[in-house]
Curated annotation (Swiss-Prot):
<keyword id="KW-0699">rRNA-binding</keyword>
<dbReference type="GO" id="GO:0004521">
    <property type="term" value="F:RNA endonuclease activity"/>
</dbReference>
<dbReference type="Pfam" id="PF01713">
    <property type="entry name" value="Smr"/>
</dbReference>
<dbReference type="InterPro" id="IPR036063">
    <property type="entry name" value="Smr_dom_sf"/>
</dbReference>
<keyword id="KW-0378">Hydrolase</keyword>
<keyword id="KW-0255">Endonuclease</keyword>
<keyword id="KW-0694">RNA-binding</keyword>
<comment type="subunit">
    <text>Associates with collided ribosomes, but not with correctly translating polysomes.</text>
</comment>
<dbReference type="GO" id="GO:0019843">
    <property type="term" value="F:rRNA binding"/>
</dbReference>
<dbReference type="GO" id="GO:0072344">
    <property type="term" value="P:rescue of stalled ribosome"/>
</dbReference>
<dbReference type="InterPro" id="IPR022990">
    <property type="entry name" value="SmrB-like"/>
</dbReference>
<protein>
    <recommendedName>
        <fullName>Ribosome rescue factor SmrB</fullName>
        <ecNumber>3.1.-.-</ecNumber>
    </recommendedName>
</protein>
<comment type="function">
    <text>Acts as a ribosome collision sensor. Detects stalled/collided disomes (pairs of ribosomes where the leading ribosome is stalled and a second ribosome has collided with it) and endonucleolytically cleaves mRNA at the 5' boundary of the stalled ribosome. Stalled/collided disomes form a new interface (primarily via the 30S subunits) that binds SmrB. Cleaved mRNA becomes available for tmRNA ligation, leading to ribosomal subunit dissociation and rescue of stalled ribosomes.</text>
</comment>
<comment type="similarity">
    <text>Belongs to the SmrB family.</text>
</comment>
<feature type="domain" description="Smr">
    <location>
        <begin position="98"/>
        <end position="173"/>
    </location>
</feature>
<dbReference type="InterPro" id="IPR002625">
    <property type="entry name" value="Smr_dom"/>
</dbReference>
<keyword id="KW-0540">Nuclease</keyword>
Length: 176
């Protein structure tokens, strides 16, 4: 083997002797997440039915009372307000993402319904919905739709790393 460091044999021997008792360190600083379990294939008919069922909850006529002061936020009655604070601080990291850019209101409602159904099916507690800025149609409607769904515990404007004012972090109620 050619010596690429231009060391003499004595220097190499000295180095090997100095590290003779060294042991490889075990990596303990990064927590590795296990990949999500891939379940059974879900029939397309069931997925479509879940979308239709979930979009049933979204009405354009009903206007829930949302606080207009400050960032967009909501907490379902009976849910601890500390959950909204944890969303605001970024304590929850979303495991599912939905980008509504370029969708019509009807498509956006269906996709929101599908996202909530997928969160329940996959046992995902926090999701990120990116509505964008655009003409503010979806930005205004998305919180109103989410506040109507019975499986949404809370939502808050996302921290900058998850989209800032163009996104919402949503907490979904999971069955125990």
């Amino acid at each position: 083997m050619k010596n690429k460091y231009h060391l003499t044999t004595d220097e190499l021997q000295l180095f090997k002797e100095s590290i003779a008792g060294a042991k490889k360190l075990k990596q303990d600083t990064i927590v590795h997440r296990s990949p999500p379990k891939l379940g059974k294939k879900i029939a397309p008919e069931r997925l479509l039915q879940e979308q239709v069922d979930a979009s049933y909850y979204f009405s354009d006529e009903f206007q829930p009372q949302l606080d207009t002061e400050g960032p967009t936020r909501y907490v379902r009655p009976g849910v601890d307000h500390f959950e909204v604070k944890k969303l605001r601080r970024g304590d929850y990291s979303p495991d599912m993402f939905l980008d509504l850019h370029g969708l019509t209101q009807k498509q956006a409602k269906q996709e929101l319904g599908a996202l909530i159904a997928a969160c329940k099916r996959e046992h995902v507690h926090c999701a990120c919905v990116m509505h964008g800025h655009g003409k503010h149609v979806l930005k205004q409607q998305t919180p109103l739709w989410l506040a109507q769904h019975p499986d949404v515990l809370a939502f808050h404007q996302a921290p900058k790393e998850w989209g800032g004012t163009a996104a919402l972090l949503v907490l979904v109620e999971l069955e125990q």
